[in-house]
Every structure is written in C-alpha cells, then in structure tokens.
Amino acid sequence: MIGRLQGILLEKQPPEILLNVQGVGYELLLPMTSFYDLPEIGQETTLFTHLVVREDAHLLFGFAQKTDRTLFRELIKTNGVGPKLALAILSAMSVEQFAYAIEREELSKLTKIPGVGKKTAERLLVELKGKFKGVKQSDFFVESTHIPLSPSIESHSESSSDEAISALIALGYKPVEAEKMVKRVAKPELTSEQVIREALKVAL
C-alpha cells in the first residue's frame, strides 16, 4: 500500500496532478481542498495517499492533510459512496465544514454536492454522525485564504474558466451546470484554482 509520496510536481490539471518521485511519475487525483495547497510546478510537495484497486484501473488519491484522507476512507465505507463521489464531497467542503453539516444534520447542504441525493445524504448522517466530536466548532467556518497570483500561472480568464469547467465536470457536475457556476464567479485576474474555489463556495 502506498501511504505517502514526496516528489516534484510536474503537472497540474485539476483535479489531477503528475508527481515525479525519484524518476517515477505518479498520477494522482486530489480533492480541490488539497489542490489549493499545492506549490508551483517544479517544486517539491508531500501528499498522503490512498490506493483504490479496480479490475480496470489502479487509482491513486492524494491529500494534503491526514485528516482529509481519514474522512475519505470513512466516506468510501459508506454504502453508495465510491471514491469519485468521496472526492467530490471533499472538493465541495473542508473536513470541518462536512463535520458541521453532519452534526447539524444539514441535509440541504449535502444534497447540493453532485451525486449526493437525499438517500445518500441520510445514509451519511446515520453512519457518520457522532464521529466528529473532536472537531472544534471555531474551525467550522474558517475563511479560505486567497492563492497569490504568480507570473508563471496562466491568468487569462478564458483558459482559467475552461480549466475550471473541466475540473467541475470531472467532480460530477453537469457541463451546463459547471459552465453556469464558473460564469458567476470568473474574473480575468483569477487562476483556475481560484475560480474553482469560488464556484464551489457559491454552489453551497
């Protein structure tokens, strides 16, 4: 089992990255909450990982924090929640926000996540309620910090918007829905990661 990888970031195409670990390129899928914490391409990063083995593919998921991976593992134990849906949930909410929604039984917030219907949301409440008592309420609504713009990042609104739309579709949103979400928040000075962050924030 691969539990942790440290290497040089070669490519970023949300929600996927390519990580060079001693000459071997690992493709990883990251929730957007972890994607926001990535350094620039060419820099070193460390990720906690979870390997999902299927008949047709081996999928490697990466997380900036151990708590994100822990929640991911709890989610995929839930009936009806696969790795891709767990990725969408962790992209839409931080661990703290998800914990708060579960403890407060906020079904309406959970069902706004693509792929989470009423039955799945109810199942999540039943199976996960009470597991987040150690999470501080003061952490629930911490404002996300803005990612600084860098000259090495393409900041043209069109390419950023296109990348953001593709990422949202990969996370389970319908193309028309993804396009609407991006149009509501896109600005010329924003990177694709910032557009995705704002779009997901508005969606909830």
Curated annotation (Swiss-Prot):
Record region (Domain II): 65-143
InterPro entries, per the entry: DNA_helicase_Holl-junc_RuvA_I, Hlx-hairpin-Hlx_DNA-bd_motif, NA-bd_OB-fold, RuvA, RuvA_2-like, RuvA_C, RuvA_C_sf
Keywords: Cytoplasm, DNA damage, DNA recombination, DNA repair, DNA-binding
Gene3D superfamilies: 5' to 3' exonuclease, C-terminal subdomain, DNA helicase RuvA subunit, C-terminal domain, Nucleic acid-binding proteins
Region annotation (Domain III) ranges: 156-204
Example of a GO MF term: four-way junction DNA binding
GO cellular component: cytoplasm; Holliday junction helicase complex; Holliday junction resolvase complex
Similarity comment text for this entry: Belongs to the RuvA family.
Notes concerning its domains: Has three domains with a flexible linker between the domains II and III and assumes an 'L' shape. Domain III is highly mobile and contacts RuvB.
Function comment: The RuvA-RuvB-RuvC complex processes Holliday junction (HJ) DNA during genetic recombination and DNA repair, while the RuvA-RuvB complex plays an important role in the rescue of blocked DNA replication forks via replication fork reversal (RFR). RuvA specifically binds to HJ cruciform DNA, conferring on it an open structure. The RuvB hexamer acts as an ATP-dependent pump, pulling dsDNA into and through the RuvAB complex. HJ branch migration allows RuvC to scan DNA until it finds its consensus sequence, where it cleaves and resolves the cruciform DNA.
Protein's UniProt name: Holliday junction branch migration complex subunit RuvA
Gene that encodes it: ruvA
